[in-house]
Amino acid sequence: MNALFSSTSRFSFSALALAAMLAGCAGGPRYEQPATAASANWKEQKAAEGWLPAAPADALDRGEWWKLFGDATLDGLAGRVQVSNQNIAAAVANYTQAQALVRGERAALFPSVSLDGSGKRSGTVGGSSTSSPSNSFSASLGASWTPDVWGRLREAVSSAQANAQASEADLAAARLSAIGDLATNYFSLREADAEIVLLDETIQGYQRAFDITSNRYAAGIAAQTDVLQAQTQLVNAKAERVGLQRTRATYEHAIAALIGVAPADFSLPAAQWTPTVPGVPLGVPSTLLQRRPDIAAAERSVAAANAQIGIARAAYFPNISLTASVGSSNVSRVKDLFSSSNTLWGLGLSVAQVVFDAGAIAANVDSAKAGYESSVARYRQTVLTAFQAVEDQLTASATLAQQEGLRREASAAADKTEQQLLNRYRAGQVSYTDVVTAQAAALSARRTLVQLQVNRQTTAIALIQAMGGGWQAGWMDGAAQAQPATSPATR
């Protein structure tokens, strides 16, 4: 008896040791964030330093970056976007779905319990008078559990969690994109308002010039061509104003769609526009890895793909499941269901191992590895594209700031030239063709200056978006610096 017990103990210990050894071989590779080529500083940062207004380092920490522009109307519209924008609503639903999938994967780690019951009353039709109907009741309580010996379920949970975090980042990206589009369309609309005001003033000036040429023609001291040229300038300016009304309506319709209402139910009255260009804290390139939602989402996709390798590898090992049940069946009275004499119980263990699959599992593992490498490449490209976007907007910010000073100077000179030539025309010193040329140049310079000012604002918006808009991946707080990814040969 002792020998049998000793033999059984040795067998049990060997089985446990083998299971532990196999469990150590199972599971996916340890995840390490892929390395990226992040420079210490931005290439165009020095070029932009003299042209970007200073801002405190925590200016964007709340994520309400649009408030940096100091426009109360924009602030109100941004609030409506966050509540009613349908792209954001879809991203919220996707995130909620991803969280539910995490809960579903995590539930597989625990046993499931089921309760079954049935009752039946039966008898014969047209039978003898001695036969009577009979009752039959059954009830059972069952439990089943698949222990996660090889880590497949844990890897599935890890993959689902990473996908949920990627979905969270996608939600942040949707908010950033929607409010960025709102701000861009809003300031473009305000720029159209400013151009309309400018054209109204220009039309008044052209009307006065037309009256002057008409009076001179009536007095016989000017040619009819002068009147026709003045009329052409006046009518063209009016046509330009009509075109700006169409442009403004287009921006207004875009804003309506962004805040989730039909264009027919939304209008934005004209208002004075202040071309404020806010300060944008730059930080260093490495912080972009945590502050840009698209980068964070791409990195989480890498983590999810890494977990898929573990799931694929777990198929090499046997599936183990445990079952237990207790219950009674075919009793005539309900109270007898709980009688010990009628109770049956059972315990079960099942093990299933694939013996031959013609390389299907190996193919799935190779597919998972390739999927991982693909996600790493997409992540690195996302990082590079993000760095490019920041550098582009830094260059644009510096260039446009320098251009504004020059354009302002050019506009002032063109205005002065227009006025001087008009005075000389009144004195009969120049032809009206010279006045027309000066008027066209002055109007072009004024409109170019206004357009450049809104370009500076939209460039600031693009730079804020490129920097992540103040968002930060919460799951990366305190994370270690990125380490080189494991080579494909060792995964």
Describe each region flagged by the PLM:
Residues 22-24:
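C-terminal motif of bacterial Sec signal peptides marking the signal peptidase cleavage site
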Residues 217-221, 425-429, 466, 470:
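A short glycine-centered flexible hinge/capping loop motif at secondary-structure junctions
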Residues 153, 169-284, 396, 400, ...:
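Periplasmic alpha-helical coiled-coil/stalk elements that build and connect Gram-negative outer-membrane
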Residues 223-225, 429-450:
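Short terminal targeting/anchoring segments
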Residues 2-14:
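Bacterial N-terminal signal peptides that target proteins for export
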Residues 53-54, 60-68, 74, 118-142, ...:
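Small/polar, glycine/serine/threonine/aspartate-rich low-complexity segments that form flexible
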Residues 26-101, 274-303, 354-355, 380-383, ...:
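Bacterial Sec-pathway N-terminal export signals of envelope proteins
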Residues 89-90, 106-107, 147-175, 225, ...:
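Sec/SRP-type N-terminal targeting helices
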